[in-house]
Amino acid sequence: MNILKLTPSCKDYLWGGSRLRSDFGIKSDLNPLAEAWVLSCHPDGPSYLADGTTLADYVTAHPGCLGTDCEKFEQFPILTKFIDAKNNLSIQVHPSNEYALKNEHQYGKTEMWYVLDCEPGAFLYYGFDHEISKAEFEERIKNNTLTEVLNAVPVHKGDCFFIPAGTLHAICKGIVIAEVQQNSNVTYRVYDYGRVGADGKPRALHVEKALDVTLRTPPVKHDFGSHLAQGCLLYTSPSPRDSTSSR
């Protein structure tokens, strides 16, 4: 099989910067250049072959190109993108497969981040710093105090984070990330710093759905690998099944 060179679909979300173009060679006239979907069969941002064929159409026409391990999936299973966060992304959550298939007619979204680069002092939000009730979660969204109870995690170049569906999170300013995720584009935004979109209106929030799917038990921090130069740090979120009773 020949190697296929893909052209990404790019996004100009308002929090983006220019480093994907200047530092990573992504060709796009968009400004800002927030994301490049470099391996994607999703209709919201497909990757393209040199002849203009989408990767999704190519995979459909050549079902054996992915080998036998992917045959059990109904669609191309992953989406890979580069993200340049010049400013904070919204605080958001992605639903599980079960919830998304029922309510959005597509799969949910679990994702993984690899930090390609970051500014000194950069951090991201990952879950809550203590368990909170659904009522408190909703109230803090309403009064703009949600960040007071979030887990702020310092990041460094080379760090890797696993973000299970249901984990409230946000990539914050000064971070460039490579993301591998499920082939989904379902995001429930709960806080956006009062920003407005290109139409001059506040960007939509999705509070009710976020209340349904967010895990409100804090992630567990694991330190290990002390014999390594920088050690290892792992955060794990409780499973949705374990947290159902406390939502």
Language model features with spans:
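Intrinsically disordered, low-complexity linker/loop segments enriched in Gly/Pro
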Residues: 118-156, 162
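Conserved metal-binding segment of the jelly-roll/cupin
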Residues: 155-173
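A short hydrophobic beta-strand segment most commonly corresponding to one strand
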Residues: 112, 170-193
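Fold-independent oxyanion-binding glycine-rich loops
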Residues: 94-95, 118, 164-166, 180
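Transition-metal
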Residues: 1-132, 192-231
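Conserved small/polar residues in nucleotide/adenosyl-binding loops
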Residues: 235-242
